[in-house]
């Protein structure tokens, strides 16, 4: 199981009571006096960890360099209150989403909460691993939303990192460079991958007894969102025929969905989509026993609810 998945599961298990107490749904966030932006997954949708902050030159005043002020939900009050971070002229800011990610889905995917009277231009890059970066354009003049589809980003990759670079529009004043209050994922997602051996016996589609502990832990992560769509994807190795593997993965997905419907029944409103890939989306060559084990998995991706995307269609 990938390290990120283990880390997320650990956080969810040790903090289950807190998560349940903080159940949220979609929320409107104020942009200015007249406008808001809607984030369908609410307060979990924000970057919450500083990776790197390189102050530009000239640098902003020291009071405008508190890197914690760009994490979590936006809290901007006015320009005289330093509850945002200034990059300085040419400065860079790299942030991470640790308990969720974002991906290219319908509509805008990312929103940069830039504040202050003047809105500087910024270069935006995203990464799935914090190493390989993809350019996703620049924002300026108060236009702070990004649609990854405009940059031919695939629809499968979940991204966890955002890097912002000030483009040196304004290089004077106490808050020189772009001023960032928060970075939010409009199309926020939670993706978890589960080793099929943890859930099923070999070539079987009935959940083993211990599988329920794993799925209960995953349900805990979903408690913080009371309305969403769960995409459940089944994957196998290449042993057997393609038809057999697709059928097996479909049955396994159905078993997972049936159990999740029970444990989430009193929590909120959820839709479920089953996608049986069989052997068609391996993450490793099926040439060793270890690699085949990696390919035998069930993936659960929590995305915004269907009625959110339907509302985008109505607007268009």
Per-region residue spans from a language model:
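A domain-level signal for the mature, folded cores of soluble proteins
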Residues: 22-126, 132-188
